Amino acid sequence: MQKLFNNSFENWIFDLDNTIYDIKAGLFVKISERITQYIMEVLSFTKEEANLVRSNMYKKYGLTLTGLMREYEIDPDEYLDFIHDVAHPELQYEKQLKLSLNNLSGKKFIYTNASQDHAEKILSAMGIEAEFEKILDIKATHYVPKPDPKSYEIMLKSFGILSNQVERSIFIEDTAKNLKPAKLLGLKTVWMENERNLEDYKDNAEYIDYKYSDLKSFLNDISKNNWIVGKSVGFKYN
C-alpha cells in the first residue's frame, strides 16, 4: 500500500453508506435490520432463515437485492423503499465536512448501491447535497451492483469520465471488494477502514491505495497539507 499521496484529481467518487457518514453513527445497523425484516415478511422466513438468505445472496451476487431479484423475484422498488424507511437523527449538519468537500478540486460524485432518494435524504441531513455533481444509484445502473465490473462501466459513462481521465479519478468506499474493479480500471482507491469488512480487506488489500478510519480524517489530511487546486501536494495516510 502506498504511503504518499501526491496527485490532485479531476473526479472524486464517493460511496454513500458508511463512507459519507461514519460507520460508527449506527445508521446502517438500522438499514440492515430492515433488510432482514423485509425478507422475513415477504418470504415468510424466520429471522435465522432470513439472515442465512441475506448472507448467501450477498456472497453470491455482491448485493442482497440482486440475489433476491434473481432467485425470489422480489420488487426492487418496494424493497428499497422498505429498507431505507428509517429515521436518522444521528446525522446532523456537518459544516466542516461541507467546507472540506467544497475545497476539493475537481468534480464530486456519489456512487451507491442504494437508491437516489435515500442518498438525497442523507446528503440533505448533513447539509452537503450541493457539493455533488450527480448521484448514481442502483436503479440507474439497471440494478447491476458494485462490485460487478459492468456497474463501473456505467458509472464512468454516467459521470462523463473519459478513458484519459480515469487515472485522475479517485474512489472512496467502505466495502473493500468494491475497490478492486475501480483499481483495475485505473482509479486510485481509498478504503474507509472498518471491522465489519476486514475479511474483504485481506482479500483485496493489493487493490487499495490508501486507507483511513473515516472520511473526515481523509479530508483533514488533504486540508492540513495545503491542498492547492492545480498543484500536486503529498500527504501520508493514517
Regions found by a protein language model. Name each.
Residues K3-Q96, D117:
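N-terminal helical cap/lid subdomain that shapes the substrate entry/recognition surface
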Residues D22, I110-T112, W191:
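Hydrophobic residues in well-ordered beta-strands that form the structural core
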Residues E78-P89, L97-M126, F132-I138:
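Substrate-recognition element of Asp-dependent hydrolases with the DxDx(T/V) motif
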